[in-house]
Amino acid sequence: MKVFILAHQDDEVFLLPHILNSEKKLFIYLTNGVSVNAGNRELRLRSLEAKEVFEKHLVRLNSEVIWWGLEHSIPEGELYKFVNQESILQIAKVIGEQDLKSLQLVTTTFEGAHQDHDASAVISRELGKFLRVEVIEVSTYPQWFSKFYSFKVMKPQQLDKSIEFSRSKVLLLTLKLIKGYRTQRLTWLGLATATVTAYAFRTYHSAK
């Protein structure tokens, strides 16, 4: 079983080679998906959208979900404030109800792409130590040039295992997920082409 520990309701797009199988999966989203200044309407839209996408595309892949960030009112961009023992123990309690013998945690790696992705990595590493399970980290979009707003996509600085996957199935689900996250179109306007290109032509690696 794999437990996906993700900051945002669309981060799964970067982990699809780990997701597209019949293995049992649990997704834990650590933020509510909107900024601290967002209104109730924006939060409702984002939450409804995320639930619709999950029901339509991920449930059929033997997946369950816990909207942890929504339940605990954790805004996007501020997950680092919840990197503490209390949060880790709360999440560990949920994960501990699963079969730990064959369990892996999958998350985004610490690479400076987004502070929430980095916080997810820190939380997952601590969970891995506490639960004594393997943690797999995946690159999202690390900064390319330090002085310019530019990013690589899914190119970890250190490569771990390469992962075999069906390019056609991953590409199709990528497009469906991006289309489903309507409130995130501005974000994906800059990332979609690079993400599709990476899945179409590159070897997919997890990150150390």
What would you call each of these model-derived segments?
Residues M1-E134:
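Active-site beta-strand->loop->alpha-helix modules in alpha/beta enzyme cores, enriched
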Residues E49-S63, P75-F82, F130-K208:
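The feature marks non-catalytic terminal segments
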